[in-house]
Structures are given as structure tokens and as C-alpha cells.
Amino acid sequence: MKKMKLRHIIIAALCIISTSCVKQKLETTYNSQENRIDQYIEKNRVVGGDTLRVVYNDGSSRLVTKEGEGPELTANGNIAFHYAGYTFSGSFSKSNLFVTNRVESATESGWTLTDEGSQILTINMNDYRLLPGLKAGLIGVKGGEECQILFTGKYGFGNKEFGIIPANSALLYK
């Protein structure tokens, strides 16, 4: 009986240790992704002598490549936009495209879009389809603004694989 209890205690302890190690590894992965995002922003922040504006919001980083005009998008507002989503591993690569409605991005990556596939997306910011990192990155954009929004896997698809996107992948949206 004592051996049985001891065995259960050891198994429970091993499970706790294993879970703790997995969580620590995941946090290390996200910290590494945050560092790569910061390095990417620093490397791409100055263009033609001009310093681009960077906005940080709830785990998301927005590098503004063209300023917009008018009122800022709110957390409950509606937005209509073209986009291209890429997995991000420290640098931008056209081959990492996983979704787009931008003809230019599709063409650059060797994709073909139908007329329907290139339609501008109109969506409410509370729509469940928006990833937390994308939503946080869009808050505050103005009409006509062009930007890159980057965030870790924690604010993307998390530990779920999604189509061709590996679990816990950092993402970049243009």
C-alpha cells in the first residue's frame, strides 16, 4: 500500500515538473520572438533618413510605413482594409505568406487571387476572426495608413496549428 501511494506521489510530481518545463519553454519561445520583432523594427525603422513611427499596444508592435489621416480606429470600430499575413522568424520573407487579399502581395509570392479573393475586408473590431495581436495592432490606425503589425505566437494562434501555420508562430501583417 505504501509503495502504491509513493508511486502516485512520484507520478504526480513528475507531471507537475513536466508541465512546468513546457510552460517555461513556451515563455522562452515567446521572449525570443519578442526580441526578434524588436530587432526587426530597429533595423527597418529608418527609411530614407526618416524615422518611422512605432506603436506598441497589448503585445503588438505596429511599424507605420505611411501615415494616415482622420480619426483613429477604436477598439469597437469598423475597418475596411487589404492585408497580407506572413509567419515571422526574424525577417520578412515573401515565401512565408499564408493569407492575403492584396494583389501585390499575392503576385510577389507567386499566388493568384480571384476577383472575390482580392476584395477589401470590412470587419468590426469585435469580430471573433481577428487575432488578438492583429486587433491590438489595428487600434489607433487612421484612414490610408500603411503599416506592418508584428506579434508573438502568444497573440496569434497560440499552441494551435492553423493550416500551414505552425503552432506558436510569430506573425507579421502588412
Segments predicted by a language model, with ranges:
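Cross-family detector of peptidyl-prolyl cis-trans isomerase
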Residues: 5, 21-174
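Sec-dependent bacterial lipoprotein signal peptides
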Residues: 1-21
